[in-house]
Amino acid sequence: YITFAFPDAGTFYWGAAFSVPKGAKLHLEGSFPHARYMSLISYDRLGAPLDSVADYLIAPKPGASNPYLFGADRNSKQRGYKIEVVSEPLSTPIPWGVYQEAKTRDKIHAPGQAENGQQQLIYRIYAGDKNTDETAGSGLPTPVLTLADGKELRGQDVCASLSSFQPLSFDQAALATPREYLNKLTEVAKARGGPAMPASNPPTWSKSSESMSRYAIYTGDNTVASGTNKKDGTFFANLDNQYVRTFINRKHGEVFVIRAKAPTTPKTYNGNTKFEDGDLRYWSWCSQQGYASGRVNKCLFDEQIPVDANGYY
């Protein structure tokens, strides 16, 4: 399990770097996984999301059903889907962290990078049902390539035609903050608040965003560029997520305790039969090593965290 760019340990990620030949068409044939959430998201070389198609937006194949719709049968046997991967950029940006009412998608836009034409997708599965494998019992989507002359390719022929073994092209800053810059930020933070900074007591929470506001917890500058106040624009972020971070330090004490009211979410881990509504689709707590590495230590997601009779944990 590769751990960089702040992953959630309750999630499995599969990445693809490829180049669709001129005039060809690519689509994916898959089966909806037995899980809390799945999505396909395309990215640029800076790790910023370009387009996202979440599970509930995907139209199932004729005769199949989408188990991610409210009230749907999560254990339906017929759960296939097909989605086209197009090379053109998306004309209208996807709303960040917003449930899209009454929409369906049969395409995901994955434009090539200006530098080398490489296209990038990440397939995510959050909180697979208990006793399922890494794909939550669904297998991985199958790529199907139709060449300009109409010939259809599958299997290894697709991989060769897509140059799918090409190295991933990305800016290193998409995975973690460069060490030299982070050292400067730490010096600024300690000058502001002492040797435990950027940790504070009580903790200071910051919303991750594009622009320098991501580092407000170091600098104290909470200025957010126009249009980015709801975004987390790099580190291969998920367009359906919002991220809030803080730092802790044992200079403030041996134990850090969090008490809060838990948002409601669908219950899925034990193979629940119906897909329920909730305040959120999913939430989790993650312990990470900070901006220097982007690595995760451990996470707990909602169904793993005990709550009391009043919904507090």
Where are these regions (language model features)?
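A compositional/structural signature for long, glycine/proline-rich flexible linkers
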Residues: 1-313
